[in-house]
């Protein structure tokens, strides 16, 4: 079975993982008129991001609306709406647009449910007449088959949609772009970025680094992270732009989400091996 939908993701996955786990900063060169003011403002920014990080980690889950645009697919947006959980390991339970995600060959419904839990992705598909999905309601793929072993390790260590917050707090230079209203809430807008040097220092394989750096170079050499934080010290929106993609995450509600569990094994067909081969071929591994 040829899984066309994976091709759009494979060449860019390494860069996406770097985006989620290594966003640094652009440097707020115009943040203040003097060195003392810059230090004071930098301290305030770090304090605000630290509070947001602590508060978000404490709540452990959220309802999120995500839109991803991939240059490889002509910029057609792929929407994913649902629950993300990071309190006890990485997990998500979302609905995504079937056609935009190129899943129409496996799912007739306009949206496809995707669950990520216990180190694997589960795609709700129509039972196929033959092959590993014959009579199965779900397609299982190991996270490592999509992201690579390093990406899977990063997800285990930093697997929540707000990982960017933790990495921005490690920088002494983050741009404070001022107050903005987002989703009807008053927020403060912060910005940082990651470049090839961050990829080189990552735990990605050499093939994955090559693919990530190539994707970064094709989009200007860096990936920019923007975060909008409200008065309750919670992110309202996070965007990541570059490396051949634009990802926007809007946080609708934090906490009090249902537990995410894997589908029954008897209803699941495993395509990890096939996806791994496609991914390795795409990045030349």
Swiss-Prot record:
It comes from the Bacteria. InterPro entries: LolA/LolB/LppX (IPR029046). A lipid is attached at residue 23 (N-palmitoyl cysteine). Its main location: membrane. The keyword Transmembrane helix does not apply. Keywords: Cell membrane, Lipoprotein, Membrane, Palmitate, Signal. Residues 264-285 are annotated as: Disordered. It is found in: Cell membrane. GO terms for cellular component: plasma membrane. A lipid is attached at residue 23 (S-diacylglycerol cysteine). PROSITE patterns: PROKAR_LIPOPROTEIN. Residues 276-285 have a biased composition (Basic and acidic residues). Residues 1-22 form the signal peptide. This is Putative lipoprotein SCO2725.
């Amino acid at each position: 079975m040829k899984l066309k939908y994976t091709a759009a993701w494979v060449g860019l996955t390494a860069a996406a993982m770097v985006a989620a786990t290594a966003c640094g900063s652009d440097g707020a060169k115009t943040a203040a008129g003097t060195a003392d003011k810059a230090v004071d403002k930098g301290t305030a920014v770090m304090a605000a991001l630290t509070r947001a990080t602590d508060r978000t980690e404490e709540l452990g889950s959220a309802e999120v609306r995500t839109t991803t645009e991939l240059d490889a697919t002509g910029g057609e947006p792929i929407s994913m709406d649902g629950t993300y959980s990071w309190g006890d390991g990485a997990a998500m339970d979302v609905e995504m647009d079937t056609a935009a995600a190129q899943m129409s060959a496996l799912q007739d419904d306009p949206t496809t449910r995707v669950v990520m839990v216990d180190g694997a992705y589960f795609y709700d598909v129509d039972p196929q007449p033959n092959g590993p999905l014959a009579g199965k309601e779900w397609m299982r793929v190991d996270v490592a088959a999509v992201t690579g072993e390093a990406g899977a390790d990063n997800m285990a260590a930093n697997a929540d949609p707000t990982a960017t917050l933790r990495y921005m707090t490690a920088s002494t230079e983050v741009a404070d772009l001022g107050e903005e209203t987002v989703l009807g809430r008053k927020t403060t807008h912060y910005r940082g970025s990651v470049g090839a040097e961050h990829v080189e220092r990552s735990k990605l394989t050499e093939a994955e680094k090559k693919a990530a750096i190539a994707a970064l170079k094709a989009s200007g050499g860096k990936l920019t992270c923007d975060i909008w934080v409200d008065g309750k010290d919670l992110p309202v929106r996070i965007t990541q732009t570059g490396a051949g993609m634009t990802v926007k995450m809007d946080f609708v509600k934090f906490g009090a989400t249902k537990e995410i569990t894997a589908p029954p094994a008897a209803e699941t067909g495993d395509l990890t091996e096939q996806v791994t081969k496609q991914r390795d071929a795409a990045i030349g591994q």
